[in-house]
């Protein structure tokens, strides 16, 4: 007998991790990569932002949950929404969005041992949290904070806004 096995791209998922900026900046709960919107109601068409990490509530929120196994393959995959992090281009000030996973150049990012996240095709551009004053979200107590994300030149001056880590929960 011959058995055919069809593999879904989601078979072999790793555990969920949140990706957070190591410097807490102005948010003692920390900032995590987050789909704009609220948890399951998040809208993938609105892209990614840095937002108060939800793990202070005891678990990783679905709109901040990345697949740890795919991260090792340079893919920032959000399994609940079946989308990947993508840059609009490989250029300074490019925004970060979400799209169906195609594993193309715009979706390949590396998280290196120094904590930098950069496009696999350009080690000199880092995923960067917006500087300046954060914006208030709509929920949380105290109110959650959020900031935009772009690609910027990797630099020591921007280190607090460019160094990331992963964790399974707080």
Where are the language model's segments positioned?
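Classical Sec-dependent N-terminal signal peptides that target proteins to the secretory pathway
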Residues: 1-11
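Lectin-like carbohydrate-binding module/patch detector with strong preference for beta-trefoil
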Residues: 11-170
């Amino acid at each position: 007998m011959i058995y055919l096995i069809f593999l879904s791209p989601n078979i072999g998922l790793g555990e969920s991790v949140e990706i957070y900026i190591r410097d807490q900046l102005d948010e003692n709960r920390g900032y995590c990569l987050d789909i704009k919107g609220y948890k399951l109601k998040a809208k993938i068409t609105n892209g990614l932002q840095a937002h108060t990490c939800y793990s202070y509530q005891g678990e990783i929120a679905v709109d901040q949950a990345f697949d740890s196994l795919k991260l090792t393959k340079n893919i920032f995959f959000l399994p609940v929404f079946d989308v990947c992090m993508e840059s609009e281009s490989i250029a300074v000030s490019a925004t970060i969005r979400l799209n169906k996973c195609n594993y193309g150049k715009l979706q390949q990012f590396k998280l290196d041992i120094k904590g930098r996240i950069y496009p696999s095709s350009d080690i000199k551009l880092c995923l960067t949290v917006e500087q300046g004053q954060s914006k208030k979200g709509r929920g949380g107590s105290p109110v959650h904070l959020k900031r935009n994300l772009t690609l910027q030149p990797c630099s020591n001056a921007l280190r607090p806004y460019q160094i990331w880590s992963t964790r399974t929960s707080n």
